[in-house]
């Protein structure tokens, strides 16, 4: 401790070092980015491919499977899932945490290139990829509305200009434009007119394609001039296509307008987007996995004036949803909680020391330690988030402990009449080892967290490092700045036989005297205390098994996301009506601020909604209570279901599900999967522990199955290719030509006019031109009958997959739900060919459950090793660790009392308690050992004296930690659901520990001392003289 004496005698140097630490911390604070939580996003890449008109089964077998085989060879792929629907396939690749997203993207592109030769012809474009997770909620949604512009024209402007500009902003991973599609020339064929003119659909398609070409024509030049050749080889509008000659009938020209309606429309008319009951185009912006959400949103907002300047006056651009306000509000709440904790801790010190000068010392030490931590956070690449700021809030109680122990011991010597500088030296020397032991053993608690892998390890690393750095800085400050300030600011007082008995002092003396009396009784009834101690151990085990558990507290981010699932045979027009009905119900709720939604595309019977709630200060209900209220109203809507879930800052996996948690069924037999999935889903829907049970297996869509008579076809001179081409031309929204414009490329889309395809009778009007040029009706060589068909085909890996999604009813924990699912699967007797496992957040929860006890045991073992090294003893660390069972009981009972499940945040609280409560024992054991060595006291006398002498600092440090955590319990507002479990755990553990360990620790100390002496006598051998 001589090294630290230099700081006492060199106050200027000490003050300047503390000022340097503070200035570095302030600079680091200003540079730190802001985020809701530490960066825990898995690198995710989405691969998309399309083949218009292809059935889901065709897309799965001919497009998804070749791509999956190639993509599955990429190193670092954690999970690969795919979903194939009408005309489209989407493959989600989730990589390991340590995989660089840009390197993964290069590998994905190489795998797509390798699979290209295996993909079917007729695909309008090569498969593409995006570095974004489609299951993540957008960080911002912009809407475009107009009274005069068509939806197609709005969509074109949004995708061609706005989306391109936004995508260039740092942090933006994907800009998904919804609500319509690109403009196109649509050719709606009249089957009867074609038949009358003897024109086949293929002939129409070929005529349009041939009439709209873009080829280089070259140039002509002479000795002086050069002329570039330009022709009118392109048709760009519906008016230009209408007079196009497609056929000659008996020498008379048949024009396209004679047999079809040609209109300027959109590529896919089966798309609709809305915002607050108005048709709208939605720009859904998602961030890159490694991007900071606040910085990305700020970048978008900074770009908005430029975007609005380039928008025509007829278009209205609005922000429909922004994730950043609730994040900022949550962080502001944590910062306020931190300030309150510092104030309360300093108040505790003042009440105990009853001196303004003495209180000023920890009032300086605490901010220096906390502010200095910001510099280390910046150097480590951390952010200001809920967890790191909660770590600093909790650190308030820790960093003041070191200063209190040093200050209180110096003050004791000053009260005995010692001179200030001498008291500072002597007091620091006496407790220096104690402070080092307390700090190192506390940091040791977090070593297992730093070594923990996966998402929980990544999530908790910033918390552990931030708290460890704060404790380290506090250790240095308490042994340098604190004794220096004590030596130069405090004054010695005359020795008093009786302490002053005023106010808190009188109460403290009374408590100390009462404690001494009760401790004497306890030391005479050690067996009873031993039974109590063993009872706390047993109660810990029982409570841990019984308490409900979850992965992460359910957050209220002020944003809800909803998935609509309608009858599988619903039409687009009916589905658009359902979207409007659902939006009206939600918009009428008093807690809702804004509603946007869209439907259409390859999945006509589904839709998505994004709901922004009013700020927490303007509504009384939580997000979950609002969902529960809306669920009752939404259930009355026939023919469709809307599943709502609160958007969370942590969402694991790339599956887009209609609920927060998923259970995935896998099978190598698609038939077995389709047989068992409805049975399992029905059984799970009946469980009271689950809500909103739904599945992505949609195999009950309406299909018209055409059966060709191949013999008749051969006799009539028709081949299968011609028949299939007929159907694709008629009903597949076939893209038959491309219109090239300076800003974009647009399609010519051909199909039978919707007026002539209202029902199945449209097939009777279809005909094929055979080899002899005769029109042969489709009914001559084909029969059709209705059947069921899948609307989507899903894979995981290379196996058929079906994901059952579910939410949790209010009051139900994730552990109760997973146990009920596992029990149900066992009771159903599902065959081995169908395998079930949790996925996404539920899967991470299962993995975390398996490692929680290991983590706690590892933390205790690490603390034991550190204490054993410091004390050079196998026994004394056990005495110190005997404080833990009572703290565990208090923490678990408090969680039960507040109806809070045991989550990852509560686990942090348990880990913190391991570090906090042992401080009391360390102070007792240190003084007892010193009294035995230097004072010649018996173990009983030594531990009794140590308990009385250290009663005041024990009460001060415990109350400081208690008041440091109390604002977390009492906090409300944004983000309180994250803070409260941590505060509840710590406060409950501290209260119970303080009540019991003041008595159990001396009893355990004496027990191990007797045990040690007994073994020493047994192992001692008489000395034999030779």
Curated annotation (Swiss-Prot):
The chain crosses the membrane at residues 15-35, 333-353, 360-380, 387-407, 431-451, 463-483, 528-548, 853-873, 897-917, 953-973, 984-1004. Signal peptide: none annotated. It is found in: Cell inner membrane. One of its GO terms (molecular function) is xenobiotic transmembrane transporter activity. HAMAP family: MdtC (MF_01424). Part of a tripartite efflux system composed of MdtA, MdtB and MdtC. MdtC forms a heteromultimer with MdtB. This is Multidrug resistance protein MdtC. It comes from Salmonella schwarzengrund (strain CVM19633).
């Amino acid at each position: 401790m001589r090294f630290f004496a230099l700081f006492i005698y060199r106050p200027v140097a000490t003050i300047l070092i503390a000022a340097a630490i503070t200035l570095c911390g302030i600079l680091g604070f200003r540079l730190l980015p802001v985020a809701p939580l530490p960066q825990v996003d898995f690198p995710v890449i989405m691969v998309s491919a399309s083949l218009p008109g292809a059935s889901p089964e065709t897309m799965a077998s001919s497009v998804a499977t070749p791509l999956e085989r190639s993509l599955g060879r990429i190193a670092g792929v954690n999970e690969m899932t795919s979903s194939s629907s009408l005309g489209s396939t989407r493959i989600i690749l989730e990589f390991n945490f340590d995989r660089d997203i840009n390197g993964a993207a290069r590998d994905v592109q190489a795998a797509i290139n390798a699979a290209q030769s295996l993909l079917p012809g007729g695909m309008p474009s090569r498969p593409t990829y995006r570095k974004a997770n489609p299951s993540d909620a957008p960080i911002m949604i912009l809407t475009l509305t107009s009274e005069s512009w068509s939806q197609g024209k709005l969509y074109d402007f949004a995708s061609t200009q706005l989306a391109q500009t936004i995508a260039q902003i740092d942090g933006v991973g994907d800009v998904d434009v919804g609500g319509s599609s690109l403009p196109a020339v649509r050719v709606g064929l009249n089957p009867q007119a074609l038949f009358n003119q003897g024109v086949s659909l293929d002939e129409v398609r070929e005529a349009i394609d041939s009439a709209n070409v873009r080829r280089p024509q070259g140039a002509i030049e002479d000795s002086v001039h050069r002329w570039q050749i330009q022709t009118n080889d392109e048709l760009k509008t519906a008016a230009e296509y209408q007079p196009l000659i497609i056929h000659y009938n008996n020498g008379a020209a048949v024009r396209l307008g004679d047999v079809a309606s040609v209109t300027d429309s959109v590529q896919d008319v089966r798309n609709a987007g809305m915002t607050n009951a108005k048709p709208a185009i939605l720009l859904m912006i998602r961030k890159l996995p490694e991007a900071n959400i606040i910085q990305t949103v700020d970048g978008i907002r900074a770009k908005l004036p430029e975007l609005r300047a380039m928008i025509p006056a007829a278009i209205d651009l609005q922000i429909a949803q922004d994730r950043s306000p609730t994040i900022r509000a949550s962080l502001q709440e944590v910062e306020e909680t931190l300030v309150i904790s510092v104030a309360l801790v300093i108040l505790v010190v003042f009440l105990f020391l009853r001196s303004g000068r003495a209180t000023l010392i920890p009032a300086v030490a605490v901010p220096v330690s906390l502010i200095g931590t910001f510099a280390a956070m910046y150097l480590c690449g951390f952010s200001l988030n809920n967890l790191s700021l909660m770590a600093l809030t909790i650190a308030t109680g820790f960093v003041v402990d070191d200063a209190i122990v040093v200050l209180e011991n110096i003050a004791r010597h000053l009260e005995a009449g010692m001179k200030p500088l001498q008291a500072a030296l002597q007091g620091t020397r006496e407790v220096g080892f104690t402070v080092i032991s307390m700090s190192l053993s506390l940091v040791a608690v977090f070593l297992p967290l730093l070594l923990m892998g996966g998402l929980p390890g990544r999530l908790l690393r910033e918390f552990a490092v931030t708290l460890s750095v704060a404790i380290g800085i506090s250790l240095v400050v308490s042994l340098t700045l604190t004794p220096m300030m004590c030596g130069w600011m405090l004054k010695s007082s005359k020795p008093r036989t009786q302490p002053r008995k005023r106010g808190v002092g009188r109460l403290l003396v009374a408590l100390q005297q009462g404690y001494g009396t009760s401790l004497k009784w306890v030391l005479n009834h050690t067996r009873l205390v031993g039974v109590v101690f063993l009872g706390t151990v047993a109660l810990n085990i029982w409570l841990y098994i019984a308490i409900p558990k979850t992965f992460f507290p359910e957050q209220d981010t002020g944003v809800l996301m909803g998935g609509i699932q309608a009858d599988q045979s619903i039409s687009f027009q009916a589905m658009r009506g359902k979207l409007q009905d659902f939006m009206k119900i939600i918009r009428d709720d008093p807690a809702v601020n804004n509603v946007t939604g869209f439907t259409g595309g390859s999945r006509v019977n589904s839709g998505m909604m994004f709901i922004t709630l009013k700020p927490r200060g303007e509504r009384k209900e939580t997000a979950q209570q609002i969902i529960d209220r809306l669920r009752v109203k939404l259930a009355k809507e026939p023919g469709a279901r809307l599943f709502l879930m609160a958007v969370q800052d942590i969402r694991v996996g790339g599956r887009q599900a209609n609920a927060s948690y998923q259970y995935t069924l896998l099978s190598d037999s698609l038939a077995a999967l389709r047989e068992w999935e409805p049975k399992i889903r029905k059984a799970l829907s009946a469980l009271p522990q689950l809500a909103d049970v739904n599945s992505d297996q949609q195999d009950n869509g309406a299909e018209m199955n055409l059966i060709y008579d191949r013999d008749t076809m051969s006799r009539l001179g028709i081949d299968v290719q011609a028949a299939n081409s007929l159907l694709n031309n008629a009903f597949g929204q076939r893209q038959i030509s491309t219109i090239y414009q300076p800003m974009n490329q647009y399609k010519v889309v051909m199909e039978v006019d919707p007026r002539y395809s209202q029902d199945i009778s449209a097939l009777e009007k279809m005909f094929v031109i055979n080899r002899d040029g005769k029109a042969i009706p489709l009914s001559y060589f084909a029969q059709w009958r209705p059947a069921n068909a899948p609307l989507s085909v899903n894979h995981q890996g290379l196996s058929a997959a079906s994901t059952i999604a579910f939410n949790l009813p209010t009051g139900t924990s994730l552990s109760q739900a997973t146990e009920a699912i596992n029990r149900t699967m066992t009771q159903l007797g599902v065959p081995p060919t169908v395998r079930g496992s949790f996925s996404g957040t539920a899967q991470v929860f299962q993995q975390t459950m398996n490692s929680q006890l290991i983590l706690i045991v590892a933390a205790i073992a690490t603390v034991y090793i550190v204490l054993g090294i410091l004390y050079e003893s196998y026994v004394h660390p056990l005495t110190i660790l005997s404080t833990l069972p009572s703290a565990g009981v208090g923490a678990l009972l408090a969680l039960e009392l507040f109806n809070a499940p045991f989550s990852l945040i509560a686990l942090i609280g348990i880990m913190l308690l391991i570090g906090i409560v042992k401080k009391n024992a360390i102070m007792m054991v240190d003084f007892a050992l010193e009294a035995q060595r230097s004072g010649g006291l018996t173990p009983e006398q030594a531990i009794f004296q140590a308990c009385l002498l250290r009663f005041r600092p024990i009460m001060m440090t415990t109350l400081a930690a208690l008041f440091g955590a109390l604002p977390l319990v009492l906090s409300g507002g944004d983000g309180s659901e994250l803070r409260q479990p941590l505060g509840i755990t710590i406060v409950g553990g501290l209260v119970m520990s303080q009540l019991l360990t003041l008595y159990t620790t001396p009893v355990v100390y004496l027990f191990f001392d007797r045990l040690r002496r007994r073994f020493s006598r047994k192992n001692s051998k008489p000395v034999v003289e030779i």
